[in-house]
Amino acid sequence: MSVVPLMFRDWWDELDFPMRTSRLLDQHFGQGLKRDDLMSSVWNSRPTVLRSGYLRPWHTNSLQKQESGSTLNIDSEKFEVILDVQQFSPSEITVKVADKFVIVEGKHEEKQDEHGYVSRQFSRRYQLPSDVNPDTVTSSLSSDGLLTIKAPMKALPPPQTERLVQITQTGPSSKEDNAKKVETSTA
């Protein structure tokens, strides 16, 4: 096997994968691009095994975390969603609970900025765990545009160590009935 094809290959071939435009058209559209924004869409559409033959799973794992606009935390105490909505004013965001879902929507009409006209809209749905009471969901918006949605988990009832047993009253004493049954079975 020769090393020459690896050293003198056309490196543009590695970039000849279908571009994923969803990264470029995400919720930050209109704020300008960074160099990493363009390259991440190329790396994200590539398989994790490069032409060199090495498996590089950290490429896809780190990009999946980076592309997510929200963070979902579920533990034994709470359900929590943190969502970056800095492009929207508080009046343009709605948070509602329907059935077992939290639905977050944001929309603002066309606005003119230095690049032209921009219109943004998003909708996200998060399924509540069965341990969460939908009536306890709260939301807060920080000054830097992070929307936090929280709900506590239902508290488990404490384990009972002692239990009172009810006594039901019956007719005649069952002691006499049991004695008659024993006599007839021995005879």
From Swiss-Prot:
Keywords in alphabetical order: Developmental protein, Stress response
Basic and acidic residues biased stretches: 174-187
GO cellular component: cytoplasm; nucleus; perinuclear region of cytoplasm; Z disc
CDD domains the record matches: metazoan_ACD (cd06526)
Tissue expression profile of the protein: Ubiquitously expressed during embryogenesis with no sign of tissue specificity in expression up to stage 16.
Gene3D superfamilies reported for this sequence: 2.60.40.790
GO molecular function annotations of the record: unfolded protein binding
Protein name (Swiss-Prot/TrEMBL): Protein lethal(2)essential for life
Source organism: Drosophila melanogaster
